[in-house]
Structure formats: structure tokens, C-alpha cells
Amino acid sequence: MSADLNSDLFNNLRLELRRGLLIVAVLAQLRREHYGYTLRKDLAALGIEIDEGTLYPLLRRLETQGLLESEWREENNRRKRFYKLSRAGRAILKQLLAELEQINSSLTRIIQPNE
């Protein structure tokens, strides 16, 4: 397998892995209210980079699914859309975190079978 093909394959698999985890990360961060820029900045500070072109469609989708609530407010003479978890979002996040913990535990046993 050529280096370019190997690199492309890795990048595609990495993106696939990150997609689901980004949802969990965004939901978890939105236990506390954020607007898009601060959400992106806080996630980046925690090691999770997310492009604007990925974040804003994700926020809209999660809101459409009833997992987020949002409202427009003026802050420092600028209108900003603030997002936070809805009650349904909190319930789903709790379930997703339990599922993630189970998957992590299983993967640890698979990857490190003798420990």
C-alpha cells in the first residue's frame, strides 16, 4: 500500500471515528450555555478541533432533533445565538456517555487482552 493511500485511508477512518465523538463532545460542553465561537474555542482548548463548517450544521441538526435549545441575544453590541442542552439532550447525553464507557471498556479489553 502506497504512503499516500495509507495516509488517505487513515484520514478517512479518523474522520469517521471523530464524527460520533464530536456529537458527544458538543452535547457534553453544552451542559453549560455557549455561543458558537466560545464552544469552538473551549473544545479546541480541550484538544478537540472542529471547523465552523462542521460545528454550525451540527448545532442546527441537534436543535432540530430536540437535543438543544437556542436563543438570540445581544452581547457587546453583537447578536449571538446561545445554545444549551434541552431536557431531552441531557437524557440522551447520559445514555451516550454510558454507551461510550461500555465501548471504551470493551475496546480496552480487546486492545490490551493480557492486562
Named regions from a protein language model:
Residues 1-15:
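Short, Lys/Arg-enriched N-terminal segment that forms or immediately precedes the first helix
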Residues 14-54:
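N-terminal helix-turn-helix DNA-binding core of bacterial DNA-binding proteins
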Residues 32-35, 64-65, 89:
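Short, charged/polar surface micro-motifs in flexible loops or helix N-caps
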Residues 41, 63-64:
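Alpha-helical residues within the helix-turn-helix
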Residues 56-61:
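Short, hydrophobic-biased segments on the C-terminal half of alpha helices
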Residues 65-79, 84:
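Beta-hairpin "wing" of winged helix-turn-helix
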Residues 79-97:
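Basic, amphipathic "hinge/linker" alpha-helix immediately C-terminal to the N-terminal HTH DNA-binding motif
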Residues 91-115:
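Amphipathic alpha-helical dimerization/coiled-coil segments
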